[in-house]
Structure formats: C-alpha cells, structure tokens
UniProtKB/Swiss-Prot annotation:
Belongs to the acireductone dioxygenase (ARD) family. Monomer. The record marks E102 as: May play a role in metal incorporation in vivo. Catalyzes 2 different reactions between oxygen and the acireductone 1,2-dihydroxy-3-keto-5-methylthiopentene (DHK-MTPene) depending upon the metal bound in the active site. Fe-containing acireductone dioxygenase (Fe-ARD) produces formate and 2-keto-4-methylthiobutyrate (KMTB), the alpha-ketoacid precursor of methionine in the methionine recycle pathway. Ni-containing acireductone dioxygenase (Ni-ARD) produces methylthiopropionate, carbon monoxide and formate, and does not lie on the methionine recycle pathway. One of its GO terms (biological process) is L-methionine salvage from S-adenosylmethionine. Residues 1-21 are annotated as: Disordered. GO terms for molecular function: acireductone dioxygenase (Ni2+-requiring) activity; acireductone dioxygenase [iron(II)-requiring] activity; iron ion binding; nickel cation binding. This is Acireductone dioxygenase. Residues 10-20 have a biased composition (Polar residues). It comes from Synechococcus sp. (strain CC9902). Pathway: Amino-acid biosynthesis; L-methionine biosynthesis via salvage pathway; L-methionine from S-methyl-5-thio-alpha-D-ribose 1-phosphate: step 5/6. The keyword Cell inner membrane does not apply. Its EC number is 1.13.11.54, 1.13.11.53. It catalyses: 1,2-dihydroxy-5-(methylsulfanyl)pent-1-en-3-one + O2 = 3-(methylsulfanyl)propanoate + CO + formate + 2 H(+); 1,2-dihydroxy-5-(methylsulfanyl)pent-1-en-3-one + O2 = 4-methylsulfanyl-2-oxobutanoate + formate + 2 H(+).
Amino acid sequence: MSRLSIFPDGSTSMDQSSPTPLLVTETPAEIQAELARRGIGFEQWPALQELPLAADQSWILKAYANEIDRVKRDGGYATVDAIRMTPDHPERVALRSKFLAEHTHAEDEVRFFVEGRGLFCLHLGAEVLLTLCERGDLIRVPAGTKHWFDMGGQPAFCAVRWFNNAVGWVATFTGNTISERFPTLD
C-alpha cells in the first residue's frame, strides 16, 4: 500500500538521529493532496498488465502505450524508457548507493510503477517527505527538487520513466548527507 510520511528535516533540532514523523498516511486521496500542496504530482492508475518474467523494455512500453503517450504529450517529455530491477541485478548495489545520495535534476522526474515498489524521499525546505510508491503509482517530482530514491537492498520493481532529454537520467548531487538520517525502504 502506498504511504506518505512527513518529517521535519532535523536542521533546527539538536538531535538529528531519529526523526519522528509529523504525518503518516496510506489514504491515496490524502497522499495526493499533501503532495499537491507541495507541488508534487501523484496519481494512481490501474496496473492491468502482468509482466512476464522475460518482458523487455519494448514489451513494457507497448503494454502501457496509451498512458505513456498521454503523460508524454501532457508533460512535453521527449523520451520514455522502462527500468526493471531484480534482486540479482548485477549493478543493484552501485545503483542503490547512487540513488540514495541527495540530488536534483534539471528536468522533472516522472515515474510510473508497473510492479514492485520504491521510496521517493523529497527534501522540501524544512520537511522531508518519504513517499512509498507501489504498483500503479505515478509520481512527478519537479525539476530542481532535492530528493533521493531507495529501491531497497533486494530491489524488485519496474518503472516507466519520462525524460525531457535524450540522455535520460542526469543528476546533480548536493553533497548533503541528510538521507542517512531517515528510514530506508528495507
């Protein structure tokens, strides 16, 4: 079940080791409303297609072509791809480490979870929002938003990703270690 946990970022607290959430909700309408108040998009779609184990990117993109085209058109995104992570993926440790570091992008980060789950952590001013996205969730993180992503130590997800550029995922790391103070997906 999708979940939103809102924490103070701890920057004004003497004890930054164990933050206490200000709000925790698993109600989709409340998640959507809280994120929207902060400029983050959140939708839930029916993830009707069961992915065969051997489904490749072209199969995934074809299965969700109508939804992909709508988001691409509405957001002006130039390219789209699909990423599928499994517990035995050879780059899972390196990718998790990279994604766990706080960073920004020059473009929106838009993801639709076809299967599995991932934790988007958004550092917005004096708040940190941990947004657990699961199958059927679409999240739009605006360009320039400080955030990190946790796919877990044994990742098992597939997400469609939209981009404004042909290069794909390009991050600018902030150097802030804030992600180390907050719960992870595991």
